[in-house]
């Protein structure tokens, strides 16, 4: 797990990531074929996350093969029901 201020240290792997607030609540879930690139090339939720939660936010991840990303993201999002995900997808 890394603070959102240390995006340059994210791994260059495919996987699911969770964004957690200062209290450890999952506020956003996503997937990427390259987690490092997703966040360091301007993630579409970054400004919203910082505006609402400040910089005391953390990113945690799990390495997942590319072929399993959609299913893993759907299951993770359904489990946590994070505030910043626009909709909670069904588990498939």
What are these regions (language model features)?
Residues 39-47:
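Basic, amphipathic alpha-helical patches used to engage nucleic acids or provide basic targeting signals
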Residues 50-66, 70:
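Basic nucleic-acid-binding interfaces
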Residues 1-33, 37, 64-75:
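GIY-YIG nuclease catalytic motif and its immediate N-terminal context
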Residues 82-92:
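Coupling/hinge elements of helicase-like and P-loop NTPase modules
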Residues 10-12, 46-55:
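Short, surface-exposed loop and linker segments with low hydrophobicity and enrichment for Pro/Ser/Thr
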